Amino acid sequence: MKLFLYHFTFIVYYFIISFSYAFSIKQEIIVSSHNASSILNTTAFWFVEFTESKYDKEEFSVIWNEVSMEFPDIRRAKVFCDLDLEFCAQQEIYDHPKVVVLKNGMWMRHVLEKNQITTKSARQFVKSHLGNCDLEQAENETDCFSDDGEYNSDSSSTDPAFELKEDQSWKHSSILRPLETLNFKRFLFGNEIMSKTRAFVMFVSLKHCEDCFHWEAVWSSITRNTDERLKMAQVNCDEEKEMCNHFHIKKFPTFRVFQGFDSIQYNGPLKYQQLLSYSNQVASYQAIKIEEGDIESIENSHPVFFLVLYDFATTSEDFSIIERLKLQLAGVAPLYICNSKALANKYGAQSQPSIIAVRNGMPIVYQAITPREFRDYKRITEWINIVSSPFITELTPTKCHSLLNRKLTVLTLLQPDSEQFFSSQEELLRLGKRWFRFQMQRQRNDIVWSRIKKYSAIAEAKKKGFARKVKRIKYSKISHPTYTESVSFLWLDSSLWLDWIVENLDHTVYVDSITPPVFVIDHSKGVIYVSDRNGNSLTLEEDSLFSTLRIILEHPNSSRLQKLRAPGLCPNGSPNYRNRYKLIVFNLLIALLILSILTIISASRLSRRRRQLLNKQPVFGFYHSLVIAKSD
């Protein structure tokens, strides 16, 4: 009986001690959007663990729970970001698990990351935020408790429970500007930096790029000198592989401009001044509303500009696509908006809203039959890439890839210090405009021919009495293809391109000639045309040049050509994948042919050997040809 009372007393005492210890520990609360005010609107400080439900029993959570139980008076909270992603995004928490300290409703910079978690580091992290204990004391394992086991605090009840320097990183500074660091979840779900403004993002990879660590300092300098209306950010592709694969980032560093979920890649030179100039252009680019009388001065001051004409019936969906076009046109050409019927008649816009590109005073109207085609963002961007350059421009290494985007390029060698320079430029511009009119007339003829075929088919169906066929053809739509250009007109300074000219052309003929020389390059085939069909050198004479261009486009093998001996006009040009694939297919066919020949030779030798074995067998009739008789 005494033994039973002894055991019963021990169990009761054990439960009393356990319950008293358990109730002395402040319970951890689960925080979400509906009860976030319980910690955000208090003056106390909290140790908040941001994690996911699948991480709740992993090493980080286990160590943090064990260490936090050693400090029963601290306030603990937990947020499951996979269950409440919006709340974590609002608090700018995108990487977890981690522990963040909340002081007076503000998040502190000193956090406990997943890669830092050990029992010692977690204990130091807690001690550095308690009482009079600072981080140095915590790292030296100095005890932060008084002799009676309570936290040592000389401050009053109204003072904060710990002393830390104020976090200044969030404050605005005109000298230092913070650089955003993005990850894929922040891009998809926490899109607050890209929803209302543009963002210029650098993609780097320290594993695949040897000099990318230099670019981090350069990018920080560009960030400080860029207009604050443009957000600046960077992405480390070693950690954010999913985001880099989403945007097909293969080279480093790569720069992209974002506006919402639209993006465009920067293809200019990777130089500090050019990147800084482009970033400021993107930051300040806006559509300018003009009046009818302003158009003349705009035509005289801009070789290329874009004009949007609208009326009272223009919808918000139409204006939204115009807003998205700013991303494509930033740093390329100005964008103007006007409500004028007179300008619509001047530029040949038959309906509103209309998008018009004006190059050297000549308009090109974006052809859209239905509202859906007008709001087709991909179709408009393809059209902008074609019409965003003037009819003639100088070929420079920095703009080389963007200018050589046609099938054929007409290049004229000019010397800026010669007397014929300006007259030759005007003649080349006249040829460019004439060729543009020729292309536009050809496209109109194609549309007219399509209409003739449609009406002829309707008449034929009516004649045969096919009512259903007549109805089907009548309501079929005649497609207006997107405007394309097959020829670009460029001029280059012969002194700057001297090495390329010597490598590919006759130096004496093409540099010392009084008449500006002209030649045509086909980039897809890597060939150059220096003469017409009759063997005469190409010049700026319209009939000869245009007839040569038409012959090359329709019958490319009928004109005299020579192969380009240099890799191409553009330095470090992109490889010609078409020729590369041709070479791969050719090598594969050669390999298959060789394999077939070897197979035939092996089969013939094997059959010959079998015939020889058959001839050596006994000639008796009861012996099989494959049986070898063994005799003693």
Curated annotation (Swiss-Prot):
Span of the signal peptide: 1-22
Regions crossing the membrane: 583-603
EC numbers for this chain: 5.3.4.1
Keyword Disulfide bond: yes
Disulfide-linked positions: 209-212
Catalytic activity: Catalyzes the rearrangement of -S-S- bonds in proteins
Keywords, sorted A to Z: Chaperone, Disulfide bond, Endoplasmic reticulum, Glycoprotein, Isomerase, Membrane, Redox-active center, Signal, Transmembrane, Transmembrane helix
The keyword Signal belongs to this UniProt entry's keyword annotation: yes
Cell compartments where the protein resides: Endoplasmic reticulum membrane
EC class: isomerase
Glycosylation-annotated residues: 35, 41, 140, 557
The Thioredoxin domain, residue ranges: 153-284
Pfam family name, one: Thioredoxin
An individual GO BP term: response to endoplasmic reticulum stress
Gene Ontology molecular function: protein disulfide isomerase activity; protein-disulfide reductase activity
GO CC annotation terms, alphabetical: endoplasmic reticulum; endoplasmic reticulum membrane
InterPro entries recorded: Thioredoxin-like_sf, Thioredoxin_domain
Membrane topology: Single-pass membrane protein
Primary role: Acts as a membrane-bound chaperone in endoplasmic reticulum quality control. Probably facilitates presentation of substrate to membrane-bound components of the degradation machinery.
Family classification: Belongs to the protein disulfide isomerase family.
Protein name per its UniProtKB record: Thioredoxin domain-containing protein C959.05c
Native organism: Schizosaccharomyces pombe (strain 972 / ATCC 24843)
